[in-house]
Curated annotation (Swiss-Prot):
Changing residue 16 to A: Partially abolishes AMPylation by YdiU. GO terms for biological process: cell redox homeostasis; cellular response to oxidative stress; cysteine biosynthetic process via S-sulfo-L-cysteine; deoxyribonucleotide biosynthetic process; sulfate assimilation via adenylyl sulfate reduction. Residues 1-85 form the Glutaredoxin domain. This is Glutaredoxin 1. The gene is grxA. Monomer. It holds the Pfam family Glutaredoxin. CDD domains: GRX_family. The keyword Phosphoprotein applies. It comes from Escherichia coli (strain K12). Disulfide bonds join 11-14. Belongs to the glutaredoxin family. Keywords: Deoxyribonucleotide synthesis, Disulfide bond, Electron transport, Nucleotide-binding, Phosphoprotein, Redox-active center, Transport.
């Protein structure tokens, strides 16, 4: 599964999401992730809203296999429910 984390520097929840994704990628052969710094890439809130298909107010915004999961708390819950990590 391919996970994309849209975040920014200085965001503690972005760091947590990246750390969890790194842990999963080290433990599982079927998990890969990409971290995208929205400031460095010039991605706007409107761009994220369009990709998510709904309003977004915070980062990180996380997608698994192109499905919008939400922020860090949503991602951690998704991992617990789907991957037992």
């Amino acid at each position: 599964m391919q996970t994309v984390i849209f975040g920014r520097s200085g965001c503690p929840y972005c760091v947590r999401a990246k750390d969890l994704a790194e842990k999963l990628s080290n433990e599982r052969d079927d998990f890969q992730y990409q971290y995208v710094d929205i400031r460095a890439e010039g991605i706007t809130k409107e761009d994220l809203q369009q990709k998510a298909g709904k309003p977004v107010e915070t980062v990180p915004q996380i997608f698994v296999d192109q499905q919008h999961i939400g922020g860090y708390t949503d991602f951690a819950a998704w991992v617990k429910e789907n991957l037992d990590a």
